[in-house]
Amino acid sequence: VLAEAVKDTLGTVIIENRAGAGGNIGVGAAARSAPDGMTLGIATTASHGINPWLFKQLPYDPVKDFAPVTQMLRVPNVLVINAETAQRLRINTVADLIAYAKANPGRLNYGSGGNGSAGHLAGELFKNQAGIFAVHIPYNGGAPAQAALLGGQVDFNFDNLATAAGNIRSGRLKALAVTTAQRTQVMPDVPTVADTLPGFE
């Protein structure tokens, strides 16, 4: 999408996807490229805000190796539960999830795209603010975590709204809340976690 949008201005754009290690592989490659203005890297909260605290040695310096250009987008996370699990456990709201977790300590688990991922950190913040316990199950990326949720291997996830939206609309996942301070225009009927846990973002 980006390459198409800028081709008339910049000419041919070559997209090179280098996933892995929480963004470190791709961002590291961008950092090692020639500083000639011909390479753009797309950084994330993970690559520049979280990973410096998780990894002893990064293949880049998040401050010195880059010149920021613009913020391209902001995608909220969404607290989702497998629709069949939601029906079986009678969980329709964030308050229901919290009440179930408190009444059944240690019974719930949640998946994420890996230790230190946005979904993991949101899950830990949620547990802390709600005063509940749920076992964290880290996966090797967001796609396997969502597959585990769809397959019923985990009870809930804090997932990227862009990747979860299709399964929410199809009815396979139930969106309980978004993690942003305000509701999202993409799904305006979905409340915020902060509606139940004030200050959560």
Language-model regions: role of each:
Residues G23, S47, A86-Q87, G116-G119, ...:
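Alpha-helix N-cap/loop-to-helix initiation residues
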Residues T44-T45, A83, L161-A162, T180:
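Short secondary-structure boundary segments
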Residues R32-M38, W53-P144, P191-E201:
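Hinge/capping helix and adjacent helix->loop/strand transition within the periplasmic-binding protein
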Residues R74, T93, A164-E201:
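C-terminal lobe and pocket-closing loops
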Residues V1-K64, G106-R107, N115, N128-N160, ...:
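N-terminal (or domain-start) structured segment
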Residues N24, L73, V80, F158, ...:
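Short aromatic/basic micro-patch
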